[in-house]
């Protein structure tokens, strides 16, 4: 039974097909278009096709639309080679023009029943004025499912002989021995799938000498006369026996194409030739050595036959997880022929027809990333690669640390971890036994951080947990300053110090203090400054309970208790706890006094001395004691004064235990003990 969308009138008005609104470019014109013009062309063609589909005037998807949807250019290799070989003889017959009009209306045919009886063919003949011989030659029958399909065109070479230089050849029939199924399974791909709908679209495909595959064959009937051999699905014996090509173009043609020696099919690139090669040799590039599941990359006919034969896509037998790299194979409905898919979840026992549903359903069963595959039947790894999935099932850890028995899936992580433990204690990490999948730093566990600090400084024997911390620390000993300010050429050992320094040169300082209206370049600088107004001191020394507003001040203070003095003067050998103290001390050897008073031109070696001196000119006393309202020039004076109100005496003599409120008092007192020692 044939459904007519509308009766074709005998006047000029008729059904609109995609070819009526399509815009064609020659190969030379297409090369002159830029990327934007090609994108515009693609968008316009796709929009026209969608409009025709919505109106019901385009049942079969044109080859041009299939190429544009997949991101390919509308020009195949055949047309490009035709432009490159202008001397090749072209052939056309009067019957070709008549068949063009027949082909135009055949695109509107739609099959309703699974079989097409003779009366339906007669109706097609009467409706569309198509010759009965064309109808018989255009129908193919599937012996398994009794589906009938039309071919898009009748081979124009069947009845019209063409003399060639090698002699006269012609073909009178086109046998289609497809063994178990004779369904037309070729490009465009969406026509190759069975549908459970009542109305199944025809698969219009031209089966002439230029049979369409994923890549259009370079030998077309318009260019060469080709005798076509029988098409069988046994080893894909599709071939072109004789081709009449002028000898002067054979060398150029061989350079531009890659051909397969068994079936003489020609491909535009090496990748497609390799894929086709594996089809003949039976090789499968993507296979699991453990289970050897098949990853089939063959054409659509083989895919359909596998559905009849019950062949499953590549499966992992251990947990019934399927890895199908050909998405088109999943769309063949096995229930149409009474077959059943065996997509089974080993945990829940559910079965699925389509692999994506099966995989998404199994993911919730995964306990954790590193759990064994045998425990739950499905590895909770999102990696699609079969070898990576197999590595979970076999519990393969190719790289193992000999010192602590830690295992790594990736070889690149092992030397990083071994170098971290090379200079430190070889403690046993068998308690952890952590498996690292994707860790940027293997020395950092996902759980609590390890107690050891394997990176040690050779100068001061200080240890660090990360190598970057050690490198940053060593700059303090070497004096290296790789970060330089482009404005004043001042160098810094840390990048954070450079960023903080660049605020001096910044024209805008967006962060302003609400108390004193002083502005800052960084938000962190404003936060530190605000603590001078609020008196907040969140950092407290655990030894003497002294608090500080900055963590750096606490770190410097703690060196008093530890006695650490890493900064040593090369001139006199004196050591200092702070680098700033060393710099100030070195100026006593050089005599440098860079800080000069603008009022009296007096110079000082320290900036604090200059600031203290400038208050004698201005009379400003910015620091006031909240207890007695006494003001001071410097904050240090205020701090020393506040000890009087607090009755605090933090400086204690180790000899006699006497305490003092100021360090200068303690220093003066210690001289008494030194004098007693010398006199004794």
From Swiss-Prot:
Organism: Mus musculus
Annotated localization: Nucleus
ZnF segments: C2H2-type: 263-280, 455-477, 483-505, 511-533, 539-561, 567-589, 595-617, 623-645, 651-673
UniProt feature coiled coil, ranges: none
Function: May modulate osteogenic differentiation, at least in part, through the bone morphogenetic protein (BMP) signaling pathway, increasing RUNX2 activation and leading to osteoblast commitment and maturation.
InterPro entries hit by this protein: KRAB, KRAB_dom_sf, Krueppel_C2H2_ZnFinger, Znf_C2H2_sf, Znf_C2H2_type
GO BP annotations, alphabetical order: negative regulation of DNA-templated transcription; regulation of osteoblast differentiation
Pfam family for this entry, one: KRAB
Gene name tied to this protein: ObI1
Record-level Gene Ontology MF annotations: zinc ion binding
Induction cue: Up-regulated during osteogenic differentiation.
Keywords, sorted A to Z: Metal-binding, Nucleus, Repeat, Ubl conjugation, Zinc, Zinc-finger
Domain KRAB: 16-87
PTM summary: Polyubiquitinated, leading to its degradation via the ubiquitin-proteasome pathway.
GO cellular component, one term: nucleus
Descriptive protein name: Zinc finger protein OBI1
Tissues in which the protein is found: Expressed during osteogenic differentiation where levels increase from the first days of differentiation and remain high during the whole process. Highly expressed in lung.
């Amino acid at each position: 039974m044939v459904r007519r969308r509308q009766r074709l009138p005998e006047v000029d008005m008729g059904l609109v097909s995609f070819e009526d609104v399509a815009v064609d470019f020659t190969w030379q014109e297409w090369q002159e278009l830029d990327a934007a013009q090609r994108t515009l062309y693609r968008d316009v063609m796709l929009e026209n096709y969608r409009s025709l589909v919505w109106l019901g005037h385009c049942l079969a998807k044109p080859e041009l639309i299939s190429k544009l949807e997949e991101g390919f250019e509308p020009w195949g290799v055949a047309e490009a080679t035709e432009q490159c070989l202008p001397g090749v003889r072209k052939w056309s017959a009067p019957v070709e023009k008549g068949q063009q009009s027949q082909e135009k209306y055949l695109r509107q045919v739609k099959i309703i029943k699974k079989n097409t009886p003779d009366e339906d063919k007669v109706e097609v003949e009467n409706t569309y004025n198509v010759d009965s011989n064309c109808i018989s030659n255009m129908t193919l029958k599937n012996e398994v499912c009794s589906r009938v399909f039309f071919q898009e065109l009748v081979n124009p070479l069947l009845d019209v002989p063409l003399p060639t230089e090698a002699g006269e050849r012609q073909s009178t029939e086109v046998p289609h021995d497809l063994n178990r199924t004779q369904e037309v399974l070729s490009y465009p791909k969406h026509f190759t799938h069975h549908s459970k709908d009542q109305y199944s679209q025809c698969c219009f495909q031209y089966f002439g000498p230029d049979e369409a595959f994923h890549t259009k064959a370079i030998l077309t009937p318009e260019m060469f006369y080709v005798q076509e051999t029988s098409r069988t699905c046994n080893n894909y014996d599709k071939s072109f026996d004789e081709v009449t090509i002028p000898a002067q173009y054979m060398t150029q043609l061989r350079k531009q194409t890659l051909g397969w020696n068994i079936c003489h099919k020609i491909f535009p690139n090496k990748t497609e030739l390799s894929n086709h090669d594996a089809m003949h040799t039976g090789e499968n590039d993507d296979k699991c050595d453990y289970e050897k599941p098949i990853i089939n990359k063959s054409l659509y006919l083989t895919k359909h036959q596998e559905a009849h034969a019950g062949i499953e896509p590549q499966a992992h037998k251990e947990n019934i997880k399927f890895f199908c790299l050909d998405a088109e194979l999943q769309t063949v409905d096995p229930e149409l022929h009474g077959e059943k898919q065996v997509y089974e979840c080993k945990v829940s026992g559910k079965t699925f027809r389509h692999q994506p549903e099966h995989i998404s359903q199994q993911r919730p069963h995964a306990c954790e990333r590193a759990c064994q595959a045998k425990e739950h039947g499905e590895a909770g790894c999102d990696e699609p690669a079969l070898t990576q999935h197999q590595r979970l099932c076999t519990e393969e850890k190719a790289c193992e640390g000999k010192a602590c028995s830690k295992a790594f899936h990736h070889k690149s992580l092992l030397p990083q971890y071994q170098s971290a433990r090379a200079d430190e204690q070889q403690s046993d990490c068998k308690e952890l036994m952590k498996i690292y999948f994707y860790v940027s730093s293997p020395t950092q566990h996902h759980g609590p951080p390890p107690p050891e600090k394997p990176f040690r400084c050779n100068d001061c024997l200080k240890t660090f947990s990360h190598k970057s911390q050690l490198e940053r620390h060593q700059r303090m000993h070497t004096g290296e300053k790789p970060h330089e300010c482009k404005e004043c050429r001042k160098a810094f050992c840390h990048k954070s110090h450079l960023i903080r320094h660049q605020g001096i040169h910044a024209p805008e300082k967006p962060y302003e203090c609400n108390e004193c209206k002083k502005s800052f370049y960084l938000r962190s600088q404003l936060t530190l400054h605000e603590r001078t107004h609020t008196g907040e001191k969140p950092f407290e020394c655990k030894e003497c309970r002294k608090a500080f507003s900055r963590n750096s001040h606490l770190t410097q203070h703690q060196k008093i208790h530890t006695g650490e003095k890493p900064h040593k003067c090369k001139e006199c050998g004196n050591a200092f706890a702070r680098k700033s103290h060393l710099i100030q001390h070195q100026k006593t050897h050089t005599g440098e006094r860079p800080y000069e008073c603008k009022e009296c031109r007096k110079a000082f070696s320290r900036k604090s001395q200059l600031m203290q001196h400038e208050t004698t000119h201005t009379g400003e006393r910015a620091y006031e004691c909240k207890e007695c309202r006494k003001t001071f020039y410097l904050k240090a004076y205020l701090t020393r004064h506040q000890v009087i109100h607090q009755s605090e005496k933090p400086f204690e003599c180790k000899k006699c235990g006497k305490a003092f409120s100021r360090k200068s008092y303690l220093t003066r007192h210690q001289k008494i003990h030194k004098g007693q020692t010398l006199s004794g």
